Amino acid sequence: MSPRERVLAALRRQRPDRIPKHFDLAPAQEEEFRRRTGSDDVSEHFNLEPRFVGISATSKPRDFSEYLRDVPDLDHHDEWGVGAISSGFHHFERMVHSLRNARTPRDIAAYPWPDVLASYRWRNLPADVRCWQQRGHPVSAAPPGACGGSLFETCWYLRGQEQLLIDLYDNPDLATALLDTVNNTLIESARRLAEAGVDILRLGDDVGSQRAMLMSPDTWRRWFKARLATVIAVAKRVKPDILVFYHSDGNIEPILPDLIEIGLDILNPVQPECMDPAQIKREYGDRLAFWGTIGTQTTMPFGDPDEVRRVVRERIETVGPEGLLLAPTHVLEPDVPWENIVAFVEAVEEYGAVAPA
């Protein structure tokens, strides 16, 4: 199988020739990778199958000075106006919520929203998708959002997490205006990504904590379910075979039936410290594929290479072979030993071959 055939078979819960794999590196790990390998291409070096595309950078940045002028130690902000203050420790930053002082829907309407739907930013996307597909790779893309989030995360990055959760109860008109503004961008972006031919539509919001959800399941259903359902429906109407991927750290098992109902195909990352991957596979494996399952709170930073190999083999046996793309459950941070990264790749290669049915 080509990498694209392998990934699409696995994520459609069919039998691949071997288990596909993926991981991302934090900036310090990218530097270590370049130092050790002399390469700039992690995916090519480690034979990681997926490829990722996105829209072009803006040529018309907005002016957020009105929203950030009271932050003297601001380092930078993204195109949505979400500011960042360096922690002085690796890539970690403190976030500045540019809509933290908003009071009414008028404040949301007056905000200088980025030009993420401008046609010039989407012009190269179809060719980028075709390029990777013609080279045999599956293509994944996410609608543009603040700091890579979709609905909940983009909104709370702008507003502040605690404040947004308060708004859902105490200022529902403002919450509705903010959620609808962001979701309308997601809807149109999902349509364009489907039209461009991407194989996998990536959505994601961390709505889970270590033991439970960040909000009650009913609150999520009231405010987020229908909006995400519209995003997914638009993409599948344009491209019925598009696969929908949803990322949330933490334990979100209470809403898995809801996500399946609105069209989810792939759950990521299935944190083993929060949800048992084998149990999730037993309960939902006839309706969901899984991307992740290798713990980055346990195995990858604190295990040794033998432990990494053992866990990889266990996941293949209990969650695979159909419906599994093996990956660490988070970007690999500086605390992950290089030897464990190599062990992960080697273990998937060693144990990941799948015999024909």
Task: Describe the predicted segments one by one.
Residues 64-114, 135-138:
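A contiguous, low-structure linker/loop signature
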Residues 1-26, 30-35, 77, 108-357:
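Active-site loop segments of alpha/beta catalytic cores
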Residues 1, 33-35, 42-46, 79, ...:
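N-acyltransferase acceptor-side catalytic subdomain
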Residues 30-69:
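Segments that shape or occlude catalytic/ligand-binding pockets
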